[in-house]
């Protein structure tokens, strides 16, 4: 099994966390990819309106895909630096692997940008979880962990270089036939680690202010709880066939 974490070293707290977490849950065999988007602007398309942070994130994912291809891995688990993997992640992945086909992506964590519907028709059961197709590709959002096949990795590398789309623009990648099928695992087996401060560079004055403020900490904790609850209620499951249920392999 191949596991690659996306984490820029300049975000020290997050980088240290995911390194410890993967050593504990996954084992010693993993990689960490992190590209600083503030010095990688040349790699973004002139027509892109992405922020430097989004460019760096996208480039980090592309670097992970290159590693998957170079190592000739059939698939890989890509994790964000705030992911919390379950203790049985290896068992889950063995069962996910049995369902994979060329060009597949499987989100083990999904934060839809809005209320989204997913189909239970022909959903694949994996223990207490189900693999479901979206009713619309826009229902697929940011993901703290996802499985990607080598063919999908190759497709996204072709579609997003130079970088024009954020790392989690699944609809964009599907439209360009970079991904042939995308499913979500429900409920999410992967959760999010709550950090004391928002995503700001190490050494940032704003980061130090937020992290050191006792008044702001309860607000941040409440905000995280609100977002988690909102995410849990954003997915609706319907007994209707997904329009993406007959997608052909690449």
Identify the residue ranges that each predicted region occupies.
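An acidic/histidine-cluster motif and surrounding catalytic segment
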Residues: 1-79, 83-250
